[in-house]
């Protein structure tokens, strides 16, 4: 792993410590579908699947946001909370998308490629960033379609007239004071936008993108590593402030209530945290700059070395067993030789013995 001053020198030591925490004692302790060789043998296929999922999520989320009608809400014509003027947007969608994508991409490119020169870090950072955007858009679109909500300036989006009120569906509810979208005169797209207050899409996307960038900078620059560089702190906190200001701007131009914005922030920040952790070893630990690619490379080496060590131990044990067997055979042969020698000596001694009258015993036997 290359080191450009933004990384620690003991990256492999950190990874090895984490590896020991995920060594499972037996197969019953392992998670479902846990196979260390699966990712090793299908690295490219798994990454292609990740990118494919990003594209699919972006397409589905965009369709939900732009094409699918939201759940209709009933409203009163004399409701002051939806009668605010429709002001010009402080940050329109055409400015939001380049802002939340270009700035994080430029920072990731600058640090991972220019400074670190680590293509794997760039790949995982970019993949995690796009995963964060795609999941956020999908969730935001789903909430808007199934829950929705009236914008503070909804009546400006609807623009009912006396003729449209008469031609639309009759009012319902106690006192017959609640109307539906059938009395609106604006286009279906604009009315649909006016009913899409919850949650704030600007807030969720901004929090997701700049929240991920804040985690990325925190991991690479190590803001709280006892160095006290205020510029690093300002870079990181600036990401969160930018996301906050984008959300507040939606309250200022009467597009959302503060609760809508708060819901968007919550979705975006939670998704950015989870997607960053999905691609890196931790969120706030000393190893939060280490990608899962580096983690798995070290884990595979550890596993291979462990298997080789076990194989060598087995071979040594077999050799020791063979040596022990040979030693046992030699001992048995030595015992047999000793027995034969003793029997020969006994026979010789017997032949040399004499009877009490001086006649050798062998002659007496004859």
Swiss-Prot record:
Species of the source: Dictyostelium discoideum
Membrane topology: Multi-pass membrane protein
Name of protein: PA-phosphatase related-family protein DDB_G0271516
Keywords on record: Membrane, Transmembrane, Transmembrane helix
GO molecular function annotation: phosphatidate phosphatase activity
Annotated family: Belongs to the PA-phosphatase related phosphoesterase family.
Protein localization: Membrane
Superkingdom assignment: Eukaryota
